Amino acid sequence: RSDIIVSILPDTKNTKNFVNSNFLKKMKKSSLLINIGRGPAVNEVDLIKHIKNNPSFFASLDVFNREPLIKKHKFWSNKNITITPHVAAITDHDSSIGYLYKRFMDFKKNKKIKSDVDIKLGY
């Protein structure tokens, strides 16, 4: 039983809602679901219910059934869900170090962090 499950499933008729209530029930109550594949692989309604019933369960989502994620979607207000703006890709470590360092220094100086998720814009 894994602490972390990463979904990289494509969007096919066989993978639609693959991660549903039945799948989630089999996971540890204190685990993390990461979806970087395609949004329709995760049943969003089932995920919300599962998190509500299992407060130690978390999800990190880069893809959704509908993109961009609508402003009133329940994911935005759920503290157990981390949303990333559909940026999963191969990382160039040399360039990412400078990128992260700059943002960290801005954070330390209480400056606005550039390129963060803007809930008002929906991404």
Model-predicted segments: where are they?
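Rossmann-like adenosine-cofactor binding region
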Residues: 1-74
